[in-house]
Amino acid sequence: MKLLIVGLGSMGKRRARLTKGIDDAIQIVGVDTAEGRRDEAKNLGLADAAYATIAEAVAAEHPDAALVCTAPLSHAAVIGELLD
């Protein structure tokens, strides 16, 4: 299974860590506009790959599911993009 986590701040990293703890075979693909957060998630082993945009991640990785871990006011826009 391939899981897309949109937002690699504290909540996104927590979800990635918990997911890996449940099943290390689940591939985590992260999305964050901040390069530092993408690098940190990969360096900590929390993301197998990380992208700057949802479109890039979906095109390259074809995830099976997604978690939205961004600021609450952005949830509707992120979910809309994921559904497209």
Q: Which residues does each PLM region occupy?
A:
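N-terminal Rossmann-like dinucleotide-binding module
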Residues: 1-44
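Beta-loop-alpha module in the N-terminal Rossmann-like domain of NAD(P)-dependent dehydrogenases
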Residues: 15, 40, 48-84
